Swiss-Prot record:
Keywords: Amino-acid biosynthesis, Cytoplasm, One-carbon metabolism, Pyridoxal phosphate, Transferase. This is Serine hydroxymethyltransferase. The lineage of its organism: Bacteria, Pseudomonadati, Pseudomonadota, Gammaproteobacteria, Enterobacterales. Pathway: One-carbon metabolism; tetrahydrofolate interconversion; Amino-acid biosynthesis; glycine biosynthesis; glycine from L-serine: step 1/1. InterPro entries: PyrdxlP-dep_Trfase, PyrdxlP-dep_Trfase_major, PyrdxlP-dep_Trfase_small, Ser_HO-MeTrfase, Ser_HO-MeTrfase-like, Ser_HO-MeTrfase_PLP_BS, SHMT-like_dom.
Length: 417
């Protein structure tokens, strides 16, 4: 018989120790990876619920298993909230991840070998937008578009590539682009050749939900997102659409189940429902506004300290530092900042001379530190500390001094109070 007082600590000390160490790491390190965030205890409560026990293949009202009357309510809540939050009339909340959601879109709209126009990974795109090491690059004919000399998306080149190659689908969205995307312009380009416009808004979904960044749903045929990152929910995916094309919606549903997945993760879907409700609260909008303010404040410090920021600024939650002229690699910068308890990720920059395993840049994002309560004053101080480390990358005394400051500010701004 299962007893509710059963716990990991008493049963599996080795695993529990690693879990506890990760908890300490999150509290004592400043998280600046743009794709990471802290989810609420309510979301974690849903993920740790008995819903994990329930198999529910199919969709609400159309299940293959019995006993789904309550998980139907859970999933319908998540669907309805997703549609309301993003102004969609279709939502699928079952994808296990953003990549799974993207895979479903490819499956629904394309045939293997079809031509797709996607953002170059080296210039800000994502693996699932056509990287040769990903299913998207292996199964489809990918034509990359990129950025111009100013670091902005080159829409003229995109239009030219579209006319020349006649892709069946154009992908909007990014994993390392700090500007505002002109979704309407992308739709114009797609319409000019009769292509689908598919937008992956994973990185900016929270900003979009709060009205801080333009919403692609009115412009795209299909939109996907993760439910973590700026949306601050559980790790998972979501598909949205608007326009009333019921045939498209059926294709998308079939592409998720039974094509790509079996039973949905009902405990995660419940957590998505919680996070979507949280994203409708007034304080969520205040949070997202602060995310954008904090990113801008950090950029200002880096520029004043002589660091190159790709595109010269940011209009969302992230930015890239180009370290080529500092004779530093992203790998070196990542490691040095890590020793000071500041977590970033190495990232390729435009025309990067280094390999993706080394890189010449780092990506910095503000969602997690803002979630802790940091405002402009704190992130400016933080950016200054980062410059101190990068200016003295081999000076362990500087790194230790910064680490002490990091530990102090983390204690004053805990993740979970």
């Amino acid at each position: 018989m299962l007893k509710r007082e059963m716990n990991i600590a008493d049963y599996d000390a080795e695993l529990w120790q690693a879990m506890e160490q990760e908890k300490v790491r999150q509290e004592e390190h400043i998280e600046l990876i743009a794709s990471e965030n802290y989810t609420s205890p309510r979301v974690m409560q849903a993920q740790g619920s008995q819903l994990t026990n329930k198999y529910a293949e199919g969709y609400p009202g159309k299940r293959y298993y019995g006993g789904c009357e309550y998980v139907d309510i859970v999933e319908q809540l998540a669907i309805d909230r997703a549609k309301e939050l993003f102004g969609a009339d279709y939502a699928n909340v079952q994808p296990h991840s953003g990549s799974q959601a993207n895979f479903a879109v490819y499956t629904a709209l394309l045939q293997p070998g079809d031509t797709v126009l996607g953002m170059n990974l080296a210039q800000g795109g994502h693996l699932t937008h056509g990287s040769p090491v990903n299913f998207s690059g292996k199964l489809y004919n990918i034509i990359p578009y990129g950025i111009d000399a100013s670091g902005k998306i080159d829409y003229d080149d995109m239009a030219k590539q579209a006319q020349e190659h006649k892709p069946k689908m154009i992908i909007g969205g990014f994993s390392a682009y700090s500007g505002v995307v002109d979704w309407a312009r992308m739709r114009e380009i797609a319409d000019s050749i009769g292509a689908y416009l598919f937008v992956d808004m994973a990185h900016v979904a929270g900003l979009i939900a709060a009205g801080v960044y333009p919403n692609p749903v009115p412009h795209a045929h299909v939109v996907t997102t993760t439910t973590h990152k700026t949306l601050a929910g559980p790790r998972g995916g979501l598909i949205l659409a608007k326009g009333g094309d019921e045939d498209l919606y059926k294709k998308l549903n079939s592409a998720v189940f039974p094509s790509a997945q079996g039973g949905p993760l009902m405990h995660v879907i419940a957590a998505k429902a919680v996070a979507l409700k949280e994203a409708m609260e007034p304080e969520f909008k205040v949070y997202q506004q602060q995310v954008a303010k904090n990113a801008k404040a950090m950029v200002e410090v880096f520029l004043n300290r002589g660091y190159k920021v790709v595109s010269g600024g940011t209009e969302n939650h992230l930015f890239l530092l180009d370290l080529v002229d500092k004779n530093l690699t992203g790998k070196e910068a990542d490691a040095a900042l890590g020793r000071a308890n500041i977590t970033v990720n190495k990232n390729s920059v435009p025309n990067d001379p280094k390999s993706p395993f080394v890189t010449s840049g780092i990506r910095i994002g503000s969602p997690a530190v803002t979630r802790r309560g940091f405002k402009e004053a704190e992130v400016k101080e933080l950016a200054g500390w980062m410059c101190d480390v990068l200016d003295n990358i081999n000076d362990e005394a500087t790194i230790e001094r910064v680490k002490t400051k990091v530990l102090d500010i983390c204690a004053r701004f805990p993740v979970y109070a």
